[in-house]
């Protein structure tokens, strides 16, 4: 994680109110090598928890979740912020604060991809 810390110090921007802008390597533009290193580190740290799936929120969490899933050999499910017409009527839905949007956002997951018996590892860009 030293690589991530160094990159935040080099390219991150503090915007105030607890907001750290990392658009140039995590959110808007993605550094694949950095995300791969993060995924490898997360995989090493969580290899023995028995997770069956990785869960994240669209959109910024997808890159670190995907590389973690790749290194753990696990599928990745991401919570949608809007319900597409292809999703069933019955869904898992919760509200979560979005500090960058300044409001609550819906997070929606289809039960087709997240069963009751899943052991879920949550990976996101900031927790």
Positions of PLM-derived features:
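Active-site-facing substrate-recognition patch
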Residues: 1-50
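Acidic, divalent-metal-coordinating active-site segment for phosphoryl/phosphodiester hydrolysis
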Residues: 126-127
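Short, flexible loop segments at the rims of nucleotide/cofactor-binding pockets, characterized by
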Residues: 30-34, 55, 97-102
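Short, glycine/charge-rich flexible loops or terminal/linker lids adjacent to PRPP-binding catalytic cores
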Residues: 74-120
């Amino acid at each position: 994680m030293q690589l991530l810390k160094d990159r935040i110090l080099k390219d991150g921007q503090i915007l105030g109110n607890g907001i750290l802008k990392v658009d140039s390597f995590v959110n808007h533009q993605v550094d694949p090598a950095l995300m791969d290193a993060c995924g490898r580190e997360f995989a090493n740290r969580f290899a023995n928890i028995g997770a069956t799936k990785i869960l994240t929120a669209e959109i910024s969490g997808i890159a670190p979740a995907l590389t973690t899933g790749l290194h753990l050999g696990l599928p990745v499910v991401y919570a949608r912020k809007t319900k597409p017409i292809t999703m069933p009527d019955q869904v898992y839905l919760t509200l979560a604060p979005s500090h960058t949007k300044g409001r609550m956002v819906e997070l929606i997951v289809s039960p087709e991809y997240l069963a009751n018996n899943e052991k879920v590892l949550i990976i996101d860009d900031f927790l």
